UniProtKB/Swiss-Prot annotation:
It comes from the Bacteria. SUPFAM superfamilies: S-adenosyl-L-methionine-dependent methyltransferases (SSF53335). Coiled coil: none annotated. Keywords: Methyltransferase, S-adenosyl-L-methionine, Transferase. This is Putative S-adenosyl-L-methionine-dependent methyltransferase MUL_0816. Exhibits S-adenosyl-L-methionine-dependent methyltransferase activity.
Length: 304
């Protein structure tokens, strides 16, 4: 089903299911003996969502490499890709903490548990924004686990297509102090004009010294819809009915690095291939890589 301007979802369907895919990847990467990341909450959150495909995958009862067109190398590339992505953004927040930033905003937070697992200073406030049912689900599951946030956590149940800047201010965001922003795994699910509007709003809410991190996928411009459908087919055969070709917004859009620089940010990007190399992992062959191609991870600081 194609996206609409007011579509809704939970963590087992549509865009929401991609948050569960990401959490399952983090759970599997957390077990990797190389120890690149450690997210102890990813697995119980995925189990609570209850999608059998992901649970079997995490438990080793379902080997992705048995799927048509999914080799063992491609399956490993999926897990390794989630490991380097998670570490990049974990390190980003670590650098923000070291610089003295004491408020963070995680946009479209999904099953992100960084408020619970990163070593935040006690006076830090972490804001999380996502659809109401997503916020409620994660909050309740983590409470049932007895998990406690390691910072002051302020969860804001709002669709990012709504007036989230007003909601964020109402929740206590101090726009006179630097903020560390995160938009992880979000941009491909936004129309081009909404991507620009997101960074316009972030800029308007940011004091000098603020930072933002995200990733940009140049391949979204000429996204191979047929290849994405082909890759989704085998998953559908095993009970996971997610068609990525219907969830993302394709077509020309501004490059995030260029757009942020034009807004006064000092922005830099690093390719995922470089992150694989930096972390001592093999760079996947093109045939084993993401159907969107290369991914650029971006961090930026607002000059003042």
């Amino acid at each position: 089903m194609a996206r609409t301007h007011d579509d809704k979802w939970d963590l087992a369907s549509s865009v929401g299911a991609t948050a569960t895919i990401v959490a399952a990847g983090r759970a599997m990467a957390s077990r990797d003996p190389r120890g690149l990341i450690d997210d102890p909450f990813a697995e119980p959150l995925v189990r609570a969502v209850g999608v059998d495909f992901f649970i079997k995958m995490m438990d080793g009862e379902f080997d992705l490499s048995v799927l048509q067109n999914v080799s063992s190398a491609k399956a490993q590339a999926m897990v390794d890709g989630m490991a380097v992505r998670t570490k990049y953004f974990d390190d980003y927040f670590g650098d923000a903490i070291k610089s003295g930033i004491r408020q963070a905003v995680i946009l479209a937070s999904g099953l992100d548990a960084r408020a619970y697992r990163l070593p935040w200073p006690a006076d830090t406030v972490v804001y999380e924004l996502d659809q109401p049912q997503v916020i409620e689900f994660k909050t309740n599951v983590l409470a049932d686990l007895g998990a406690e946030p390691r910072a002051t956590r302020r969860a804001i149940p709002i669709d990012l297509r709504g007036d989230w800047p007003v909601a964020l201010r109402a929740a206590g965001l101090d726009t006179t102090a630097p903020t560390a922003w995160l938009a992880e795994g979000l941009l491909i699910y936004l129309p081009p004009e909404a991507q620009d509007r997101l960074f316009d709003n972030i800029t308007a809410l940011s004091a000098p010294g603020s930072t933002v991190a995200t990733e940009f996928v140049p391949g979204i411009v000429d996204f191979d819809v047929d290849r994405a459908r082909q890759m989704s087919g085998p998953f559908r055969d095993h009970g996971l009915d997610i068609d990525m070709s219907s969830l993302v917004y394709t077509g020309a859009r501004n490059h995030v690095v260029d757009y942020l620089r034009a807004k006064g940010w000092d922005a830099e990007g690093v390719t995922r291939s470089k992150l694989f190399e930096r972390n001592g992992m093999a760079v996947p062959a093109p045939s084993d890589d993401d159907p969107l191609g290369e991914i650029i991870f971006i961090s930026a600081a607002l000059t003042g």
